[in-house]
Amino acid sequence: LQQALDKRGMILNLMYFYQGQDEVFENVDAIRRAVVNATDWLIENNARNVIIEIANEHDIRGWDHDRWIHDNMDKLIELARARFQEKNAGWVLPIGASTGGSMRVFDHVRDHSDLTMIHGNNRTPEEKRSRTAELFADPKMPGPIYMNEDDSGRETTLEVLARELASCDAVFSEGGSWGYMPWRQTQMFPFRHYMPAKTSKLEPGMTLEQSD
């Protein structure tokens, strides 16, 4: 995937940890090793088109290990960054971590990140606009303001599409970048792939296979 994206001039947002899978790690030493191993793989494969997201929604409920990943995010960011120097890479990838719909940025993450990562889930377009403007104007916030996930509704309808487009416009207008999350395609298992419909226009009454 990383190589295919690179050939198309695209960037991979690579998430190391999520609360739904962190139970596979036996202890915090295993978490540290995961950061080292994943980052070393990126370096060894010259994967320069990557943003490292140490943890996705590190502030929400559900994390195991007594929320160790959230509490030690600064150390994990620096651990990943140190691998580039240790390996004499001569280059480094941007590193950060995202919060959920709180759109909050924690000090111990902010002070060690290369960019500011938030989610707009279940927020109105105006709330997203306002928060993006606040972050963009704050000189303490690192790098780009990157809303890399936004859940504006879980059905493929015109109403949800309108909220998605309004959210994109709101974030863009205040200097942020916006990430579309097609919930039905990314959050369901097993993964389902539908061929394109006969028209690119979303219309009421379409079957699920056509609208998705």
Residue ranges and their predicted role:
Residues 33-34, 39, 49-209:
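Extracellular glycoside hydrolase catalytic/binding regions
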Residues 1-53, 76:
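An active-site-proximal structural segment forming one wall of the substrate-binding cleft
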